[in-house]
Amino acid sequence: MRTQSISSHNVQSSSFSANQHAAETSISAGGIISEIVYNADQPIVTHLLLPLLQQLGTQSRWLLWLSPQQKLSRPWVQQSGLPLDKMVQLHHINPLFTVDAMERALLTGNYSAVLCWLPHELTEEEKVRLRHAAQAGNTYGFIMRPESTGGDAYRLFPSLKIHSTLYH
């Protein structure tokens, strides 16, 4: 998996688990944006991201999934231990407006995390907008993007996949 934090913040050692520390860092740092590039052959991303989402699900705020053209599987959400009553999904949005929708959602501060699936890399201007929105809303933003098929010779890190069983 290749992740890229679009926000810089200091991480101090702690006796807390990594997920608890990450959730607390989000609160103290004012929110962050991270990009996860995934590949269809490696399904481990759910094992990495799910514990953090479970921890964030204990907050009083919502978890928002912006997944154009795909719908989350209700049985998967229940089986994963995520709070069904705190899940919001927008899947009938135009992929061209997904970044704008993510920015607006991050700014509201109503969400612990906003997950967004994008087919392309973000521009520098989009990264700045999302970083500022996440900080203003004190929210985690996760940008999920499939690995591009070209340029594999230059790939430095393996990527991960979100199982299609997440959707029905």
Swiss-Prot record:
Pfam family, one: SulA
Region (FtsZ binding): 105-111
NADP as UniProt keyword: no
Superkingdom in the source lineage: Bacteria
Protein induction: By DNA damage, as part of the SOS response.
Alphabetized UniProt keyword annotations: Cell cycle, Cell division, DNA damage, Septation, SOS response
Gene Ontology terms: biological process: division septum assembly; DNA repair; negative regulation of cell division; SOS response
PTM info: Is rapidly cleaved and degraded by the Lon protease once DNA damage is repaired.
Segments of this protein annotated with the region Lon protease binding: 161-168
InterPro entries: Cell_div_suppressor_SulA (IPR004596), P-loop_NTPase (IPR027417), SulA_CellDiv_inhibitor (IPR050356), SulA_enterobact (IPR047696)
Coiled-coil regions listed: none
Family designation: Belongs to the SulA family.
Alphabetical list of HAMAP family matching this protein: SulA
Subunit and interaction comment: Interacts with FtsZ.
Protein name: Cell division inhibitor SulA
Source species: Pectobacterium carotovorum subsp. carotovorum (strain PC1)
Gene: sulA
